[in-house]
Amino acid sequence: MTQASSTSPEPSRRQPDSGIVLYDTMQRQKVPFVPSVPGRVGMYLCGPTVYSDAHLGHAKKEVAFDVIRRTLLHFGYQVRYVTNVTDVGHLQDDSDDGEDKIARRAALERLEPMEVADKYFWSFVEDMEALNVLKPSINPRATGHIPEQIALIEELIERGHAYVSDGSVYFDVRSWPEYGKLSGRRLDELEEGTREAVREEKRDPRDFALWKRAEPGHLMRWASPWGEGFPGWHIECSAMSLKYLGEGFDIHGGGLDLEFPHHEAEIAQAEAAGHPFARYWLHNNMVTVGGEKMSKSKGNFTTLKALFAQHDPMVIRFLLVSSHYRSITEFSDAAFESARSGYRRLTEALHEIERRLPAAPDQDDPALLEKIAGHIRTFEDAMRDDFNTPRAVAALFGLTTDVNAALNAGEVGRQALTAARDAYRTLGGGVLGLFAEGRTEREDDSQIVNALMELVLQARQHYRLQKQYAQADELRNTLAAVGVTVEDTREGPRWRR
């Protein structure tokens, strides 16, 4: 099942020798990115647990890795992008106790668990489409891959890294000394921080569930060699990433809050079973509200649907790409106002270029063309440097400043305007995803709009010359009501949106 979202941008025809460096959590430093197969990238992202509507924290993760994927496409790589859907096994306290989050929501809403999963999955798809997030290559669900998870658990038991206890199966942490290498936690430190209340069926409090016995009345249950039950939260990602990307795939991504225990467990499950796992680990930082992490458990979140009622989704996306994926994004009215202003500046520049293009003269503008090329180089260098979107956005603003200055100074040639337009579309649209398909006018539509606006401005100018100011003001106010601003300049009236 795949998300219904925007069409993937065409990968560049250049040879993918991009010079990208990225921050690898495992190595705790920036390292050159070298895919295992030249020109191809396998990428896995931990997706949503579909038991309620998504909030801005979820959007940050999805947009961050969408931009990383788009950047790889821009530099010529073919990308297989897999992101899972957790629709079973994620318990209330993110460990091995409590109710399944989806089963609990099903009881609250008086629905079947799969009705809840479908309802919130499609809600998530709708939100991602609004944010112009590209659909995954593959979007596997945990409940659709129970046999693969059981098979991986059996491998771990056979190799002595898992044990059966009263119908449940646990990973034996002591059998795998490398456990903790991603997060940098030592086993003795983990033992000190473990809760005193430990399930009696565990040999060690640090062990985690691979398969859970289904208690009487539990709604989600499958047959297994150990009796009826359901998979633990961590096993699905190991099983599904290996199935669709193979051993030693290139990039595994997710939120910083998943580094431990989820990603740590994923590595242990795969490698203890003899399967080399992800080669690079990338983690996005959180969204905060008043300095605290935005989360459902804290109750300090606002759903994306509620935000969409107040803000253009593209303004929200602009807010998210304006900070680095490894930096904290603060949720505030001031941040949204700044994002709205910045995004409007870019879109107005693009619209003005599209407005001027049909009548642009065939003249050379070598100085402006060189400036445009310089901004493109700056943008691409920023994205090569661990996907530095703040610097990339700054390059777009630099492009905007130079193009606006040239337009204000007089006529700009068709070649320079075309180069500027293509830079906005390729970099701002294709890489950062800020100009969703269908949200900026096609060239033929733009020409029609421009011609109609010229007629309206001529009519308004006629009223002004005849000193019929009430009629002229009425036209201006009518245009303002639909988001069009008219400015009276020395060169005559101009309009913008």
From Swiss-Prot:
Q: Which domain of life is it from?
A: Bacteria
Ranges spanned by the short sequence motif 'KMSKS' region, renumbered to the chain: 293-297
Q: Which GO terms describe its cellular component?
A: cytosol
Q: Extract the Pfam families matched here.
A: CysS_C, DALR_2, tRNA-synt_1e
Catalytic activity reads:
tRNA(Cys) + L-cysteine + ATP = L-cysteinyl-tRNA(Cys) + AMP + diphosphate
Localization, UniProt: Cytoplasm
**Which cofactors go with this protein?**
Zn(2+)
User: EC number(s) for this protein?
Assistant: 6.1.1.16
What Gene3D superfamilies does its record include? Cysteine-tRNA ligase, C-terminal anti-codon recognition domain (1.20.120.1910), HUPs (3.40.50.620)
Q: Which GO BP terms, alphabetically?
A: cysteinyl-tRNA aminoacylation
The record lists ATP as bound by 296
Q: Which CDD domains match?
A: CysRS_core
Q: What is an example of a GO molecular function annotated in this UniProt entry?
A: zinc ion binding
Q: How is the cofactor bound?
A: Binds 1 zinc ion per subunit.
How this chain assembles, per its entry, is: Monomer.
Specify the protein name.
Answer: Cysteine--tRNA ligase
